[in-house]
Amino acid sequence: MTQYSTIAELQNFIVLDSYTRSSMVSEPPAGYQTEAALEREFIEDLISQGYEYVPSHVTPDALLCNARNQLQALNNIVFTDSEWGRFLEEYLDKKSDSLAEKTKKIHDNYIYDFVFDDGHIQNIYLVDKTNIARNKVQVINQFGAQKNRYDVTILVNGLPMVQVELKKRGVAIREAFNQVHRYSKESFNSESSLYKYLQVFVISNGTDTRYFANTVKRDKNSFDFTMNWAKSDNTLIKDLKDFTATFFQKNTLLQVLFTYSVFDASNTLLIMRPYQIAATERILWKIKSSYQAKKWSNPEGGGYIWHTTGSGKTLTSFKAAQLATQLDFIDKVFFVVDRKDLDYQTMKEYQRFSPDSVNGSESTAGLKRNTEKNNDKIIVTTIQKLNNLMKSESDLPVYQKQVVFIFDECHRSQFGEAQKNLKKRFKRYYQFGFTGTPIFPENALGAETTASVFGRELHSYVITDAIRDEKVLKFKVDYNDVRPRFKNLETEKDEIKLNAAENQKLLLHPDRIKGISQYILQNFRIKTHRTQGNNKGFNAMFAVNSVEAAKLYYQELNNLQKESDRPLKIATIFSFAPNEEQSAKGDIKDENFDPSAMDSSAKEFLAKAIGDYNVMFKTNFGVDSKEFQNYYRDLAKRVKNQEVDLLIVVGMFLTGFDAPALNTLFVDKNLRYHGLMQAFSRTNRIYDATKTFGNIVTFRDLEQSTIDAITLFGDKNTRNVVLEKSYKEYLEGFKDIAT
């Protein structure tokens, strides 16, 4: 009989491409279904999906007895009473365990070497992560004392892992959230409580259902971090019946708990969002199906993920890379960033997700050593180092191996050359791109687009999705012609005209620099919400067009606040930007990490600015390459911690830098497309209730450029979703400019 090998395994995704909603015919109107009836219906739906209902396990002793039975069945053993007592005391229900230690047992330490009474040692598993279907899923309800009686608990192998709090239809879902918040303070975390094993909370009022991680760092504001489940096209699944049929499908729930979650180095449990899971699943499916069809080393064997800036691409790419390293036919996984500063940031993030899962390299030689190591660690590197390695080494063992490349926002000048070398050197590779702003024919400068390099789009989650889901904020853009005599230049779009010497001179005219600097100082505290005396408010960034502009603004701003009793702490950073061709319209010029290539006047000014910084923060940085890198890192940390009030930049920090407490971007620079979206997105991270949008204050007329960019990276209706109305539009009676 002929043997056929499968070309591509079934997609078996947990984030579904299509889902038919439950019939709503039998659903009673809001107000008619009691909370108890909603709970009963929910449990019946779970039973019909294969959950075992255990009606009488509502006391701690009954819960422990059930856990014993389930763990014995999972491990094919029988504990004597004394062995079970020791197992509880030493490991399962250790009195000194915190919530974090219990979570660590589920994620990392789920196998325990137990010494039985007869002296033999055996591995006892809490969960089976290899064969996920072996884990027993049960449901109990109304556990606990009268005061804190929990609605519905999902047990996995006898351990409470998901807690569901229900409110009847029509009641605000926040009430369920507040109840969980109260329980976790009062009783979930009491000594010797198996409820410390809880990983996920689900809250529902029947019509809106959300999930979120159980983490020590939760407060009442973290309602903002609750999530709806969704289909792969990002359509939300909110109704409890639909949520139950999808999220609570047994395999889906177990995958969310054990595969699509990360317990990071700071003891925070991160449960992935549906779009992050969807992207990861589709990358893994593509690797497997391309391997089986032998479609490696071409765009057909890969694809790209379009996830908007601020939607958590780093976690998604990490999980995709981590799961790819676990595929038995994959030898190496590379995560490639396009700038040295992102190399460092990604290493820090990846190490936070899993300290031992990554190899970084300071040099091309270090990268070469990492390719030779026989382990399954993810190699994080820059495109420059990878390109140098391919140019200098014509024959390396890794070139013949099965390799996955995941590129983050790589569409710089070096990208074209690196792609040619990749095709030449690596014989069996699969490559995937992550981008918040793809290159389409409309914003491409050459022939290459994101799709022509990486293959088709595998998943998208665009800015309108993120704003709807309240994962990022809208932008409020104000254009200010502070000095009317310069207005013509500020509205000029032609780069050639703008770069003409006389126009450059006018844009840097002392009157213009002074006028803009005064405007910034006068409006800074209002824009950054620092008008209340004790309010820490936010901080800001100022994007300027050149090193010369940075110098003039830095001097003028400091000069103007000499007499101030509360001067702003101002810092600046820039470096040499080689004169390279852009690969997409609106790319922000890439600055390298070597200030030594700058002219002497720029270097002198940078040394002076770093000197001021050293005095301000009692540090000791300089302009040589290594010290400059350390300055960059220290500055990044202080901007995130709001120790720096205003950071003046030319290109650095405008892409890939996350500082949720930054809410304002001042702009004296012509931004377009990719560069505009990247720069604006520094301001729109969710932070707290005071931060309602990202403030963009421009001293060039970027209105049309803004509309062009958000239309390209969203859709024709995007403008009304992405932009808050400007002051001018409110004055004109809420008129919307047609997109």
Predicted regions and their residues:
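A short beta-strand element within the Helicase C-terminal
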Residues: 649, 653-678, 694-698
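Conserved C-terminal RecA-like helicase domain
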Residues: 505-646
